[in-house]
Amino acid sequence: MSRRNPCKFEIRGHCLNGKRCHFSHNYFEWPPHALLVRQNFMLNRILKSMDKSIDTLSEISGAAELDRTEEYALGVVGVLESYIGSINNITKQSACVAMSKLLTELNSDDIKKLRDNEELNSPKIRVYNTVISYIESNRKNNKQTIHLLKRLPADVLKKTIKNTLDIHKSITINNPKELTVSDTNDHAKNNDTT
């Protein structure tokens, strides 16, 4: 009985050729070396998905390096403002990743103070509650929050981003001492240009 060669796609993950593939997918026929390579690959994949120190955003949510260079050039707020204004070709994906980072910077207690200062029937209370719920969701699982934001229609996402940016600006105006990392970078860039 002749043994067929193991499928190289199956060794490194999963073969998508189906019945058209003429190589062996039967692990019992594979030589020990091929089994070890597959086992090592699968164990590394499991380890990577469990390790919190490794940034798996790009694999899980599709955040590519392009998104990160846009963010580096424009800053988190710049990416979001560009997405709202439909400039700089910012994708929905990169806007959602930037939104998640902005939500990480925001403190829900500051927003609750702003909410408590509003009148009872003010429509802003609903906006504050929405942003607070996104902050809490992002704190628990930022990848899931990015996924939820991506599923929003574009106009709803833009409105949510605009409301969040307005809240972020009002908080930074009220608390000028609490500058975020992105704000300090912007101030440093402005000082260099003058």
Swiss-Prot record:
Q: Summarize the PTM comment.
A: Phosphorylated by host in infected cells. Only dephosphorylated M2-1 is competent for viral mRNA binding. Cyclic turnover of phosphorylation-dephosphorylation of M2-1 is required for efficient viral transcription.
Keyword hit for Transport: no
Where would one find the signal peptide in this protein? none
Q: Where is this site: Involved in RNA-binding?
A: K8, F9, F23, K92, R151
Entry keyword set: Activation of host NF-kappa-B by virus, Elongation factor, Host cytoplasm, Host nucleus, Host-virus interaction, Metal-binding, Phosphoprotein, Protein biosynthesis, RNA-binding, Transcription, Transcription antitermination, Transcription regulation, Viral matrix protein, Viral transcription, Virion, Zinc, Zinc-finger
Q: Give positions of the C3H1-type zinc fingers.
A: 1-28
A GO term from the CC aspect: host cell cytoplasm
Which portions of the sequence form the region Binding to the phosphoprotein?
126-163
Specify where it is mainly localized: virion
Globular core as annotated region, ranges:
76-171
Q: Does the keyword Secreted apply?
A: no
Where it sits in the cell: the answer is: Virion; Host cytoplasm; Host nucleus
Query: Segment Oligomerization: which positions?
Result: 32-49
Which SUPFAM superfamilies does the entry link to?
CCCH zinc finger
GO BP annotations, alphabetical order: regulation of viral transcription; symbiont-mediated activation of host NF-kappaB cascade; transcription antitermination; viral transcription
Q: List the disulfide bonds.
A: none
Region described as Disordered:
172-194
**According to its UniProt entry, what is the function of this protein?**
Acts as a tetrameric transcription processivity factor that binds in a competitive manner to RNA and the phosphoprotein (P) to prevent premature termination during transcription. Transcription anti-terminator that enhances readthrough of intergenic junctions during viral transcription. Preferentially binds to poly(A)-rich sequences. Plays a role in the association of the matrix protein with the nucleocapsid, which initiates assembly and budding. Also, can activate host NF-kappa-B through association with host RELA.
Describe the family membership recorded for this protein in Swiss-Prot or TrEMBL.
Belongs to the pneumoviridae M2-1 protein family.
Q: What is known of its domains?
A: Contains a zinc-finger domain on its N-terminus essential for its anti-termination function. Contains an oligomerization domain. The central globular core is responsible for binding to RNA and phosphoprotein.
The name this protein goes by in its record: Protein M2-1
| Species | Human respiratory syncytial virus
